[in-house]
Amino acid sequence: MSATHLALLRGINLGPKNKIPMPDLAEVFTKAGCKDVRTYIQSGNVIFEAIPEISIRLPELIAKEIQKRFGHKVPVVLRTTGEMREVVRENPFFKEGAAEDILHVMFLTDLPKPGAAKSLDPDRSPPNRFMVRGKEIYLLFPAGFARTKLTSSYFDSKLGTIGTVRSWRTVTKLLELMKERNLTPRRRDAK
């Protein structure tokens, strides 16, 4: 049985680099066996339906196809609706009452290497803060996203994994879109 998934692509359509038109990106997912593919904004958010046999291999398949078709090396992070619900529910900064416009989440491809989180410097970019929770890093940027030293490359090198960041507004909107799909009845013969 198929389930709703979210793919988060890192580093596409940011300025002049790694341009991928959203219809072309949706086509890549459809050709990989995904159904009901929908993109959200231009930064590489793709919501789709897939059976488990496809979703397990999907990050690698999509990354290879993007490299082949567009010439871009783009990491792909995958989450289910349940995982996204947990991301929203467990945001420690939101629980502290932080304003939504300074909250972000970094989604990691894998769990950090054991003990790797201890190598992170909590004072690297004050007053900005972070908390590592499983395959997510919750980010609080009161000084602004553009000026932080808490970058994807910093976390990638320290944790031994790859991540991509989304604003809290985008995270909650993506979950809303995923939940809407789960509430909408589908015809059995729908393609």
Regions found by a protein language model. Give the residues of each.
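Surface-exposed, charge/polar-rich loops and edge strands
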Residues: S2-L183
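Short, low-complexity, charge-dense intrinsically disordered segments
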Residues: T184-K191
